């Protein structure tokens, strides 16, 4: 066990970000700022609608409101720091601030994994067992499911962050990333990180593998049920209720599985291209995905589209 005072030699980290490409920093500052504003606006509107519109007081939209709030929390934990790093010559972050950011970003990511599987279960019950839906997805059932997602994600993040921050950082303090991303921080440790790698692998199985299998099996049954619907209009209507969620799942898990699926204990020599790819994938996962979520649900869900129209009408003609 590494004692806490062994980490005292490093009191701050330097975030490399796009320091090697200074001409791109201002361009990325404007681009990410605009995307962040879209995230706040789009997800904020979805939260407002799920709370204020009585037609959306259903489990599906309660989970959607949680997802939107989660996306706002996740981006707010990292985007302001990224924006500041684009304008600041010396891009530093304290040891404690790095730990907080690592905890928040990991917690939000793990929570979203569980939350998306809960949303898949909601669609499975609604389409495959509609008569039991009011009982299985009652308020007394779906609210604990959502709360459990947050608790599970936060617990996993606490474990991973604690393990990472107890490592000794006695030499290099330059993080080759935009933020305190946990894999980038582990590369700086001057001790054996096999426990961290094993722990990360177990967490990947629990929060990536299990939800992916759960969602996959849910959609196998959902699609099989939809195909048995005799009318084309009925099949179209049934699929429209889950197409937005399926699109979000593919984008989210496709990105996060690629980024976290194989944690590396040390950075290989001459891996500059890999580091750049990791940064871009992390940026896509951290900014683009939360921006797309409300757009996807607004375009592919008729109830959300109707609620948006009602909200605009009320604001413009009230």
Swiss-Prot record:
Q: Which residues lie on this side of the membrane: Extracellular?
A: 1-27, 83-100, 203-205, 260-278
Detail the disulphide connectivity of this chain as listed in its UniProt entry.
none
User: Where is this chain's protein located in or outside the cell?
Assistant: Cell membrane
GO MF terms here are: G protein-coupled receptor activity; olfactory receptor activity
List, alphabetically, the Gene3D superfamilies matched: Rhodopsin 7-helix transmembrane proteins
Pfam families xref list: 7tm_4
Q: Which GO biological-process labels does this protein carry? A: detection of chemical stimulus involved in sensory perception of smell
Give the top-rank taxon of the lineage listed in the UniProt record for this protein.
Answer: Eukaryota
TM regions (residue ranges): 28-48, 62-82, 101-121, 182-202, 206-226, 239-259, 279-289
- Any one annotated GO CC term: plasma membrane
Family in the record: Belongs to the G-protein coupled receptor 1 family.
Name the record gives this protein:
Olfactory receptor 13C7
Native species: Homo sapiens (Human)
């Amino acid at each position: 066990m590494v004692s806490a005072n062994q980490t005292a030699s490093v009191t701050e980290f330097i975030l490399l970000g796009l320091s090697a490409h200074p001409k791109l920093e201002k361009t990325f500052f404007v681009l990410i700022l605009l995307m962040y504003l879209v995230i706040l606006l789009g997800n904020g509107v979805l939260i407002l609608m799920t709370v204020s519109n009585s037609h959306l007081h259903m489990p599906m939209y309660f989970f959607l409101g949680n997802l939107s709030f989660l996306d706002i929390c996740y981006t707010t934990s990292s985007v302001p720091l990224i924006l500041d790093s684009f304008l600041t010559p010396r891009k530093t972050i304290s040891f404690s601030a790095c730990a907080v950011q690592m905890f928040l970003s990991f917690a939000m990511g793990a929570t979203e994994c569980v939350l998306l599987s809960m949303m898949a279960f909601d669609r499975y019950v609604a389409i495959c067992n509609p008569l039991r839906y009011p009982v299985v997805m009652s308020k007394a059932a779906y609210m604990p499911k959502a709360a459990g997602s947050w608790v599970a994600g936060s617990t996993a993040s606490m474990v991973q962050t604690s393990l990472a921050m107890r490592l000794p950082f006695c030499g290099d303090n330059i993080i080759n990333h935009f933020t305190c991303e946990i894999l980038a921080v582990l590369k700086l440790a001057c001790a054996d990180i096999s426990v961290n790698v094993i722990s990360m692998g177990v967490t990947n199985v629990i929060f990536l593998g299990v939800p992916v299998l759960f969602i996959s099996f849910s959609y196998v049954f959902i699609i099989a049920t939809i195909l048995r619907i005799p009318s084309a209009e009925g099949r179209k209507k049934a699929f429209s209720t889950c197409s937005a969620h399926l699109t979000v799942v593919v984008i989210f898990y496709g990105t996060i599985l690629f980024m976290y699926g194989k944690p590396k204990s040390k950075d290989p020599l001459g891996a500059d291209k890999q580091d750049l790819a990791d940064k871009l994938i992390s940026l896509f996962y951290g900014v683009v995905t939360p921006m797309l979520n409300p757009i996807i649900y607004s375009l592919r869900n008729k109830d959300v589209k109707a609620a948006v129209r009602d909200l605009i009408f009320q604001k413009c003609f009230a």
